[in-house]
Amino acid sequence: MEKTILVGLVNRNQDHKKCQEYLDELEFLSFTAGGTVAQRFTQRIENPNPATLIGKGKMDEISTFVKAMDIQTIIFDDELSPAQEKNISKILKIKVLDRTNLILDIFAQRAKTSYARTQVELAQCQYLLPRLRGMWTHLERQKGGIGMRGPGETEIETDRRIVRDKIALLKSKIKTIDKQMSVQRGNRGKLIRTALVGYTNVGKSTLMNSISKSSVFAEDKLFATLDTTTRKVVIGNLPFLLGDTVG
């Protein structure tokens, strides 16, 4: 398990109680992603620091804890700008995530079908694009050559173009899969379609298994289900299609 710490903000829009509720959920998300929370940090701040979100004093406190406890990852409940993410990483020298990034990581772990994996990859690329500056990326760095703009192109321009090309490719792939799924839905005839909806981890997949007598994957973790599953169900001589939704 990866040792993590959580950071939440208290302000006029979010009191201490609400902040703790969000951190409770963030801790569950961290556990789902494979992390164990060593400590939570909160700060009352009305005007977040544009460079690091939190104030210098709180950052120093966190930095001391990170070094003493050998923390690997810091997770912010609030959305970080690309600049804030970069600055915090420079100061703490550990992995920096926000809630969005953490959820995308869980999605990447949980996606099973080609459609779900493609959607997650698209979301990750769209999240990554504005954050490329100053980051070491896993993307292949090429300058010049067939299909590349030319030897004068900078590394960051190359990375951005590769990500944009990838986004276009993924969108095209999703469009193709959507067409295929539309044909499949048409082939199911005129059966009534229903869906189980609700917040993540409330028991939709468990209820689906009970009603349809099937074995849809269910687990006591957030976002255990990422792929929609449809089953034919008959209740009181009425046949219909029941779908399990994301969460």
Annotate each language-model stretch with its function:
Residues 13-17, 49-52, 110-114, 155, ...:
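Flexible beta-alpha connector loops of hexameric P-loop NTPases
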Residues 1-4, 135-247:
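Conserved G1/Walker A P-loop phosphate-binding module
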Residues 26, 125, 163:
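A residue-level signal for conserved active-site and pocket-lining positions in enzyme catalytic cores
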Residues 102-120:
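Short alpha-helix plus adjacent loop in nuclease-associated cores
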Residues 16-19, 52-56, 78-79, 111, ...:
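Conserved phosphate/pyrophosphate-binding and hydrolysis machinery centered on Walker-type P-loop NTPases
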Residues 1-105:
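N-terminal accessory targeting/assembly segments
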Residues 122, 126-139:
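A charged, well-structured terminal subsegment
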